[in-house]
Amino acid sequence: VLPDRRTPAAPPGRTSNPPFPQVAIVAASRRKRTGDRGVTERAYRRAMADIFDAYALADAWDEMFERPGEVRTAYEPVLAALRPIDPGELRFRADQMARAFTDRGVTYAFAGEERPWPLDLVPRILDALEWDLVQRGVAQRVRALEAYLADAYGPCRAFEDGVVPWRLLLNSPHFHRAAHGVEPPGGVRIHVAGIDLVRDEAGDFRVLEDNVRVPSGVSYVIENRRAMTRVFPSLFAEQHVVPVDGYAQRLLAALRAAAPGGIGDPRVVVLTPGPSNAAYFEHALLARLMGVQLVEGHDLVCRGNRVWMRTTRGEMPVHVVYRRLDDDFLDPLHFRPDSVIGCPGIMGAAMAGNVTLANAVGNGIADDKLLYTYVPDLIRYYLREEPVLPNVESFRPDEPGQLEAVLDQIDQLVIKPVDGAGGQGIVIGPKADRETLERTREAVRADPRGWIAQRPVALSTSPTLAGERMAPRHIDLRPFAVNDGSDVWVLPGGLTRVALQEGNLIVNSSQGGGSKDTWVLAEGPAEQHVEETGGPGPLPQKAPRQLGPDGTRTLVQEGAQQQ
């Protein structure tokens, strides 16, 4: 059940409460000073029973508990901080945090309603060894996909050698001939990537999905950390949590490095579909943190295969465009002619080598879910390495012999549209009714290329506040990687998404999911500070609705946000 996001009245006796109250053992410490240790211990046991008494481990890996009553070492300080807090007080603090998010405009659209971004108070924690594995696996994956894109829009060696079938490229709606032969500066097409991971029943990380077009969600990583450092300030110092506030500087450095050659001081802009887009807050936040201009399509003009930005002081040249809209809407001269949110001629300027588009046009061929099934082979082919992170076991209905096997076992598999986003169109066979299974069977039979099938994975669970108790909820992890051409840097932590409804495996916010702050523990002390936003332009004060420029939902919002 989704938590009630209304802000309740303060508990009796409370006169005020800060937006991000520190979780502290106040009542317990007072009792200790009076010497009433027995009362304190009983209060601890009572609070522990109230919050975790109904916590039953599911048939999945639990992030906090190794087994009933046995806490994993990394979580011991967090559990100690939660124990003395009354459940009603914990709920009150969570609602106060939601109210603070609303005041800052950190919201999202769900079922046509604007809601505060749901952040759970229990963090997801990864120790240094776990994170080393994750970041090596994510960086390896990005390098392999980068090599694939260069090959697919160049010599096509992997296709000639039979590693990947030609039909995968030629039948892809994301293959753009305009991008063929275009050599981006530094050879980088994937400047930003979001690689979705899950932890299976054995506790091993597996890759669930690659996002290398317009990966979204990093602003929530930043905002989650800003909130949690105010809730658990002492824990951050005690736990040596690696900070996340270096992302904007890393991204800006990568974008500047991607500028066309011969530009001494490149001008970078963030191109947004506009305030009606569901992730407009993220676009504005990143532009502000990087100290660059946030622009819409009508703010740019192309002339002589160059891009200019209209300003009150006249037109200024633009060298790098970090674009947050889909290929189809980017340039009406090359793609959809009815697009009113793009910039006519910008693709021609990119093809002429006078502006860099980040991420590159045509990257969709690399995060096609059917291509996902070939990535382990691509890692071996291009990098001569074994995959650090395995895939989820997958099947390709478009291959001879696999279609009938998938159709026969459809009630035991997870069926996904290869071009789906935001959890849309996913059918979980073991939980689907007969009518849904039959409809899905016919859809797969009619278009085998449009689907993949996967073995169900019992996503790991994490204690999550449900009402006034903790309950196990399924989670995934989206680490964000930045590629500057010489190194692939992975933001420590990433976005942990949580399915707030009991038993649900769909974690996407567009499907009612929430989030957790992801703590990566350093081996030694990690400097902590909350970065204040700076740079040109205020953040939006009112959260935008997920509507298009004409007041209706448009495809670009799905493509830009649901990744």
Question: Model regions: which residues?
Answer:
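Residue-identity detector for glycine
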Residues: 13, 35-38
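Preference for protein termini
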Residues: 1, 8, 17, 27-29, ...
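Compositionally biased, low-complexity intrinsically disordered regions
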Residues: 18-21, 34
